[in-house]
Amino acid sequence: MNDAPTPNSFRAGPDEDGRFGIYGGRFVAETLMPLILDLQAEWDKAKSDPEFQAELKYLGTHYTGRPSPLYFAERLTAELGGAKIYFKREELNHTGSHKINNCLGQILLAKRMGKTRIIAETGAGQHGVASATVAARFGLPCVVYMGATDVARQAPNVFRMKLLGAEVKPVTAGHGTLKDAMNEALRDWVTNVDDTYYLIGTAAGPHPYPEMVRDFQAVIGEEAKAQMLEAEGRLPDMIIAAVGGGSNAIGIFHPFLDDKNVRIVGVEAGGKGLSGEEHCASITAGSPGVLHGNRTYLLQDGDGQIKEGHSISAGLDYPGIGPEHSWLNDIGRVEYVPIMDHEALDAFQMLTRLEGIIPALEPSHALAEVIKRAPKMGKDEIILMNLSGRGDKDVHTVSKFLGMDV
């Protein structure tokens, strides 16, 4: 996976307790701690096992379709009139997003641990689809927890999961979004620790999940680095990616963290604006607390109760963020900014019409930030954006906001 980080590297974390500075850790029920420690031990062995790495690489090539292309967005670049814009085309992967990278790695771990049942949480449905896909590939039953709100707005992905043989359990608690789905998945896991593997989709949760998910997703940045050197003979000036829990972003950011001349920007969901509570900008407008087994930036009230938040994008509709992102924000290595729903919708339409690529609403947030920054940069500068998912799943949501019937 990653080349070994050097001393004083931004890539050296987490420590042995799973912490990135004050963030991360393992805040779990006593019944789960033995399982978490078993997972840690199995992960430590798998990282250095050539057979595990070879099987993962084989599946990446022949099942996922890696490497994903690096694409120069010529018409978008000309339209914006500034920096050259490149996309890392993760939406071309099998299942339509970056999520499959992590799911393949974790299902191989589940097999090593002798687990016979897979559970997962999902927001946009992309992780649910990827989890159901790998479960089908390896012949394991799969239960996907999905907030009832997301079930309604992501109907195509719900049907795909069912086609793949997964049981989709709508969660009506709270606002029926990703946070609530994750709560239910954790309850299931506590009840079924012996036979069940919890396949977490984002770079959050108790250690070792944030590290594991990052390392399985780092293939994005590793490939992009080599591809950029081949295409331009140098690294990009800026990398931009959308951040919900943060798996696609940490996947492209991590291999570049020690390249000091590469500016890195994470884009949070600004929803309907930061003045109220209808957003999911955990770093921009949140504060540190504990949720889903790790300490990180959260949207919470004065009593530490988690706020619900909002985003037009189901995949960014989460009131927290991966702990490594929290740390990268605090040390100033990565800049985190919000993009509003309407800006993401405008970016969605612009890319579709200029490049013939229909992006998911998640990377549309990153694209909106690209649209802001590229014109202010020189024509000799380069922006690399992670195009983390395709927009088929979002067509109904977008059509509703545009006042069109589909």
From Swiss-Prot:
GO annotation, cellular component aspect: cytoplasm
Metabolic or biological pathway, per its Swiss-Prot or TrEMBL entry: Amino-acid biosynthesis; L-tryptophan biosynthesis; L-tryptophan from chorismate: step 5/5
InterPro entries the record matches: Trp_synth_b_CS, Trp_synth_beta, Trp_synth_beta/beta-like, TrpB-like_PALP, TrpB-like_PALP_sf
Keywords: Amino-acid biosynthesis, Aromatic amino acid biosynthesis, Lyase, Pyridoxal phosphate, Tryptophan biosynthesis
Residues with N6-(pyridoxal phosphate)lysine modification: 99
Pfam families: PALP
Subunit relationships: Tetramer of two alpha and two beta chains.
Function: The beta subunit is responsible for the synthesis of L-tryptophan from indole and L-serine.
Record-stated family: Belongs to the TrpB family.
HAMAP family: Trp_synth_beta
Protein name stated in the entry: Tryptophan synthase beta chain
Naturally occurring in which organism (per UniProt): Agrobacterium fabrum (strain C58 / ATCC 33970) (Agrobacterium tumefaciens (strain C58))
